[in-house]
From Swiss-Prot:
InterPro entries: Bifun_inhib/LTP/seed_sf, Bifunc_inhib/LTP/seed_store, Glia_glutenin. GO terms for molecular function: nutrient reservoir activity. The keyword DNA damage does not apply. It is found in: Vacuole, Aleurone grain. This is 13 kDa prolamin C. Residues 77-84 are annotated as: Octapeptide unique to cereal prolamins. Keywords: Seed storage protein, Signal, Storage protein, Vacuole. One of its GO terms (cellular component) is vacuole.
Length: 156
């Protein structure tokens, strides 16, 4: 279903890209929004999949606490980092917003009951917040904002 949506969105973007736009027109703003959503989806998919697969619950008897196994998935990490670096070259703010979107996805899954273990959810959230440094993306301090809104409304 996601693939069909992405292809449909690609078709819309391709059709819109061939036409000339007036910068103030509604269709130009719609084109920008669709392009941003497509870019975000392209990055979100491999990165959220990398985070989701990074920690898996190891099967244990019911009387023992669940343990986690760290999965080394270099291919998914490379795909995630490659996409995140491409976005960061254009805008560090966009890269940060993508990381925040992944964290929000994880939190929604946690609250909807997808995660039964709080430790797994916390480990994945921590990994997500560290994605930029894992991928070697560091902010340009000359152009970074003084404070960045984070999930939960906390300002840093």
């Amino acid at each position: 279903m996601k693939i069909i949506f992405v292809f449909a969105l690609l078709a819309i973007v391709a059709c819109n890209a061939s036409a000339r736009f007036d910068p103030l027109s509604q269709s130009y703003r719609q084109y920008q929004l669709q392009s941003h959503l497509l870019l975000q989806q392209q990055v979100l998919s491999p990165c959220s999949e990398f985070v989701r697969q990074q920690y898996s619950i190891v099967a244990t008897p019911f009387w023992q606490p669940a343990t986690f196994q760290l999965i080394n998935n270099q291919v998914m990490q490379q795909q995630c980092c490659q996409q995140l670096r491409l976005v960061a070259q254009q805008s560090h703010y966009q890269a940060i917003s993508i990381v925040q979107a992944i964290v929000q996805q994880l939190q929604l899954q946690q609250f909807s009951g997808v995660y039964f273990d709080q430790t797994q959810a916390q480990a994945q959230t921590l990994l997500t917040f560290n994605l930029p440094s894992i991928c070697g993306i560091y902010p340009n301090y000359y152009s970074a904002p003084r404070s960045i809104a984070t999930v939960g409304g906390v300002w840093y």
